[in-house]
A protein has these predicted regions:
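Short acidic/polar hinge/loop motifs at secondary-structure boundaries
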Residues: 198, 244-271
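A beta-strand signature from Gram-negative outer-membrane beta-barrel systems
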Residues: 214, 258-300, 304
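Gram-negative outer-membrane beta-barrel transporters
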Residues: 499, 603-606, 628-723, 823
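Short, acidic, small-residue-rich periplasmic hinge/interaction motif at the N-terminus
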Residues: 110-138, 142-200, 234, 271, ...
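C-terminal beta-signal and adjacent terminal beta-strands/loops
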Residues: 707-712, 719-743, 764, 770-826
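Extracytoplasmic beta-strand/coil segments of soluble accessory domains associated
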Residues: 208-245
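Surface-exposed extracellular loop regions of Gram-negative outer-membrane beta-barrel proteins
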Residues: 423, 467-472, 514, 533-582, ...
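Outer membrane beta-barrel strand-and-loop segments of large Gram-negative receptors
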Residues: 442, 483, 489-491, 576, ...
């Protein structure tokens, strides 16, 4: 084994060296260095200002008259806003829109009270480039249309008539609309923290609920925030918090986000075609970045804090900024058990259930220089649930330490050391007890290289050590298993901008996992084509491997997964990782109608070597052997999924929202010769609608509010879908058992074909009737859950205490008009 591992590592090293030599041939750089200075009489001399790049979220502190510098990504539109830090609330804000044409450059600008002065960009002699800064209206021979017009600006006329030295008539919010290239990567959806807070119909701002609203993403029940993406299982989604794995980010009741939005920057979500940098999952990647605190304030220990009180939970957050250090910390706890006790006491409920959870989250960032940054984050979450005879507790810990260093204009280096923990206990009386503890230590490092025109290379190496301890006691069967695999990964990828309208991204990911002694290769490929200024087409495909899988005990919905790595059985059989081939395409069109964006996607995905779990009855001593590993009971299943998705959205104006439709089929088959079946998360069709109305507020509201920052909104979210699969039952019989001291009759229910039945269709409307407040100051909202009180099925079983056995269902959320939330910033 040691010789084999050495051979594999030598091969990986040669690959990395080869890629390094290949990309080191470069001579030109791709990023844009943006130098600026604020000279404006409306700001006080030496007043501290906050400069924010809205597209990237990058922010820095400066003062009037002091130069600042920031690195911008190439080939995109930027919005740069400058604000002061007036603690009275009378903030001044001035925003500029920049559009770059040409190749790489460094340019400078001075922001004044009446005009913007721009130096000529430094570009290669054979290439012409222009930088445009514009606000309310640029003075030129041809009029410049504002964003209220239905068509875009004629860029060629604008360049010919003013170019880089256009004069600004008034320094206000940007209203000029210019041509823009898509910034997001192929297969990626980007959701900002601000948009998550504005999501219609949510009782609390929720990262995962915002993802569930996307087409192709299935939420199986009200009681869980688990997601199923394009026919994949819940364990096939990779959750990353600052590059640390979070294994099972769920809270009971499904009303609360695991991650606190106050401490999160933008969320990146890949539901198809994620690049070679990400792996060990088959379906999707949800990447969250911890937010740096103090971006919108002067240097203070407690520059911004908030307290949030809702019907079931309370949350506190604070952030600050001193010198090169910035931080944000947040915590939350629930009192849902006390609320349920109160509801039971006054007769609103008859539910003997106790539940609680706690979350702690934070980020500390330190800038050693403009080129070197250290970032330490943490997330700790703990849950407990008691519902006699069921007892469960589980928790997640993720602690990543990352460093970023910009070596020069061509190279930048990233590294992360991460610790992740997931534990879970489940007991059902004295009949069953399952415990699992999973620890992982990971080291990740990667280099980005931009030294070749129109190429961005990324290559890196990862090493992860996992220790998983599993204990199970079920009737007469006892299993105790400890696994300690190492997982080595080397990858290389390139984003090649073939032309302004073609972006090709390709890569290769190499894996070696020690417990299963498995070497795997994952090729990835995607192509983005801009058909014209508003239309684009994305094509992607690839091969994906998953070395950490969940153990499924039932076909019906469960709250959590029990994770288990691929390994080697006691008889020497190597368990293969789950694998998948994915092929997908997506068409997008901005402004299909005025203000409406349209997307349509299709996909086909195969799945192989999926773990199935079944314990066979065995009266021998071997069934309780301490040498037994859990994988001895594994079988495998194969399957496929295919479908299409349609989406129409409107994000601006006095009303906003969207409608999504998806239709799909997912089929699996176990290798024991049984018939194909629908997996428990199969949802043939789903319709999702969200709608929000700005009744009163800023420029986009139906009525303008006299006081700046005030708003009053309402919103709703509707979902209609097929029910989840269930196994219907054919009948029952009496099993008579004669023991040494007793005689008993046991009713045994005879199941039919696996998942051949289906629950009733799902329908739910959530209404956020009141959403009122002042931006950055306070907010109050009132949400009604399940407005129509539709009875949605959650779990089905047969009560064998009655003859004949009675089919019994547990419902999901009823009509709940009590979701109140108040938030105050100080």
């Amino acid at each position: 084994m040691g010789k084999g591992l050495g051979t594999v590592m030598s091969f990986m090293l040669k690959i990395v060296v080869f890629v390094s030599m290949m990309v080191a041939l470069a001579a030109a750089h791709e990023r844009i260095i943006f130098n600026g200075i604020v000279q404006d009489d409306s700001f006080e001399a030496h007043e501290k200002l906050n400069v924010e790049i809205l597209e990237t979220g990058e922010a820095l502190q400066t003062t009037v008259g002091a130069p600042f510098s920031v690195v911008l990504p190439a080939d995109t539109l930027w919005n740069i806003c400058v604000t002061n830090s007036d603690t009275s609330g009378a903030e001044k804000e001035k925003c500029y829109e920049l559009l770059y044409f040409g190749n790489d450059s460094t340019f400078s600008k001075t922001l004044g009270p009446n005009e913007v002065t721009v130096d000529e960009p430094i570009v290669p002699a054979q290439v012409s480039g222009n930088v445009i800064l514009s606000e309310a209206q640029a003075e030129s021979k041809d009029p410049v249309k504002s964003s209220s017009d239905s068509s875009d600006v004629d860029v060629e006329k604008l360049l010919a008539s003013g170019g880089a030295n256009s004069k600004v008539t008034e320094l206000k919010k940007v209203v000029v609309q210019l041509r823009r290239r898509p910034k997001r990567k192929p297969g990626e959806s980007v959701v900002s923290a601000k948009s998550i807070k504005r999501m219609p119909g949510l009782a609390e701002a929720d990262v995962i609920k915002s993802i569930q609203a996307l087409p192709g993403v299935v939420a199986s029940s009200d009681f869980s925030s688990k997601i199923y993406v394009r026919g994949g299982a819940a364990d096939q989604n990779l959750f990353l918090f600052d590059n640390a794995v979070v294994y099972s980010p769920v809270h009971f009741f499904g009303l609360f986000s695991t991650f606190l939005v106050e401490g999160i920057d933008d969320v990146q979500f890949y539901k198809s075609g994620f690049p070679a940098q990400y792996g060990n999952r088959l379906s999707s990647v949800l990447k969250m970045e911890g937010r740096a605190g103090g971006q919108d304030s002067v240097e203070e220990w407690f520059s911004k804090s908030s307290i949030k009180i809702s019907t079931f939970a309370a949350q506190l957050h604070t952030e600050g900024h001193k010198g090169p250090a910035r931080w944000v910390f947040a915590g939350r706890t629930t009192y849902i058990g006390y609320i349920l006790d109160l509801c039971n006491a006054i007769g609103l409920l008859d539910l003997d259930l106790d539940s609680e959870f706690t979350d702690l989250q934070g980020t500390f960032m330190y800038d050693f220089s403009k080129d070197t940054r250290l970032k330490l984050s943490f997330y700790i979450g703990k849950d407990r649930l008691e519902y006699d005879p069921l007892y469960m507790d589980w928790g997640n810990t993720a602690i990543p330490l990352g460093i970023y260093h910009r070596i020069n204009d061509k190279w930048d280096y990233n590294a992360t050391l991460a610790f992740s923990e997931f534990y879970q206990t489940m007991k059902i009386g004295d009949f069953m007890s399952i415990k699992m503890e999973l620890y992982s230590f990971a080291g990740k490092q990667w280099l980005n290289y931009r030294g070749i025109d129109n190429h961005t290379f990324t290559f890196g190496y990862e090493l992860e050590y996992t220790r998983e301890r599993y204990q199970e006691q079920m009737a007469t069967i006892s299993v105790a298993d400890v696994e300690k695999p190492f997982h080595h990964v080397a990858y290389a990828q390139d984003a090649w901008k073939i032309s302004p309208d073609y972006l090709l991204q390709y890569g290769l990911r190499l894996n070696y996992q020690s417990a299963a002694q498995h070497f795997g290769v994952e090729p990835r490929l995607s192509l983005n084509v801009n058909l014209d200024e508003t239309k684009s087409l994305e094509l992607y495909g690839g091969y994906y491997l998953q070395y950490m899988n969940s153990i499924v005990y039932t076909d019906q919905e469960t709250l959590n997964e029990f994770y288990y790595p691929v390994t080697t059985t006691t008889d020497g059989r190597h368990i293969k990782p789950a694998s998948s081939w994915l092929f997908a395409a997506e068409y997008s069109q901005r402004d299909l109608f005025e203000g409406y964006d349209f997307t349509a996607g299709v996909y086909y995905k195969t799945q192989s070597n999926l773990n199935t779990f079944a314990v066979e009855s065995d009266s021998s001593d071997d069934s309780n052997s301490k040498n037994m590993v859990l994988a001895d009971n594994f079988g495998t299943a194969d399957g496929y999924s295919m479908g299409y998705e349609l989406s129409l959205r409107k994000d601006k104006g006095w009303w906003f929202g969207g409608i999504n439709w998806s239709q799909s089929i997912s089929v699996a088959r176990v290798d024991d010769g049984s018939k194909p079946y629908f997996p428990s998360w199969h949802q043939p069709y789903a319709l999702k609608l969200d709608l929000g109305i700005n009744w009163k507020g800023g420029e986009d509201a139906l009525w303008q509010h006299k006081k700046k920052g005030r708003y009053f909104r309402s919103s709703l979210a509707l979902k209609y879908s097929s029910g989840m699969p269930i196994s219907e039952y054919k009948g029952y019989y009496m099993a008579k058992e004669i023991g040494s001291q007793k005689y008993s009759d046991n009713i045994v229910v005879v199941p039919g074909s696996r998942n051949a039945g289906r629950q009733t269709d799902y329908f739910r409307i959530d209404l956020k009737a009141i959403d009122i407040g002042r931006e950055g100051k306070w907010n109050f909202s009132w949400t009604i859950i399940n407005l129509t009180d539709h009875d949605n099925m959650f779990f089905t079983f047969y009560d064998t205490r009655k003859t004949p056995p009675k089919k019994t269902s547990i419902s999901q959320f009823p009509f709940l008009p009590i979701m109140l939330n108040y938030e105050y910033y100080f």
